[in-house]
Amino acid sequence: AATTPGTPGGICHMLANYGTMSLKQVLAPAMQLASGYPIDAQTANSIERGKDRIKEWPYSKKVFLPHVGEKREAPEAGEIFKQEELFITLSKMVEAEQLALKKGMSRKAAIMAAYDRFYKGDIATEFVRGCQEQGGLITKQDLANWKPIEEATTHVNYKGIDVYKLQQWTQGPALLQALNILENFDLKSMGYNSTKYIHTVYQAM
């Protein structure tokens, strides 16, 4: 099921309120990868195995299957893999931030200008168009209404290490419960990925 995208807003919120860098700096590595990188064999082969499902979605097909009609339709290992639309979206967010900075806005306000462009501006318009074109139900109002929520984490101490996870709306508590179970076993003595090790972890999870 598709949900209102929260990752861009979450990143902007955390960076604006708790970070020191600009959005341009933070997004630079992602933009570099989106502009093209040599794809690894594992990812390329995974795309090839899932190509029939990918073909059901025209935009995904365009990105992930550059050799449609050939025996192998996914990228070859080492082939330059590009996500041009992702690069454009990230560039628009950076552009919004940089324009805000030129107007004299603070670092925080400039980052939130990028946030607004994603959730209320032309990015939102294009997102909704593409979503609804494919039968999705997300509206511009859904995007405009989305807000990040800060909440207290939950945690356990596993063998002297504090492990923090989000609350019950995620699988976080299940992982913490598994760690509580595994606290009673000496996994190290079993040998990493040994039969006994895998069986014990599997049973706990």
What are the roles of these predicted feature ranges?
Residues 1-205:
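Feature marks proteins synthesized as precursors that undergo proteolytic processing into two chains
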